[in-house]
């Protein structure tokens, strides 16, 4: 049986990346919540840096 998680960097960035988050109102809310909580890594895009 094929597993559900098939790692793919491009898919991950397009779905959970900074630009994807900024594209929708709810995505911006996610970023705001993570900033408020004090997360150093806001999105998967920040993991590379």
Curated annotation (Swiss-Prot):
GO terms for cellular component: ribonucleoprotein complex; ribosome. Signal peptide: none annotated. It comes from the Bacteria. The keyword Manganese does not apply. One of its GO terms (biological process) is translation. InterPro entries: Ribosomal_bL34, Ribosomal_bL34_CS. GO terms for molecular function: structural constituent of ribosome. Belongs to the bacterial ribosomal protein bL34 family. This is Large ribosomal subunit protein bL34. It comes from Mycoplasmoides gallisepticum (strain R(low / passage 15 / clone 2)) (Mycoplasma gallisepticum). The gene is rpmH.
């Amino acid at each position: 049986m094929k597993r559900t998680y098939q790692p793919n960097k491009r898919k991950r960035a397009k779905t959970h990346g900074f630009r994807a988050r900024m594209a929708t109102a709810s995505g911006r809310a996610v970023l705001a919540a993570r900033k408020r909580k004090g997360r150093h890594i806001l999105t998967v895009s920040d993991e590379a840096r």
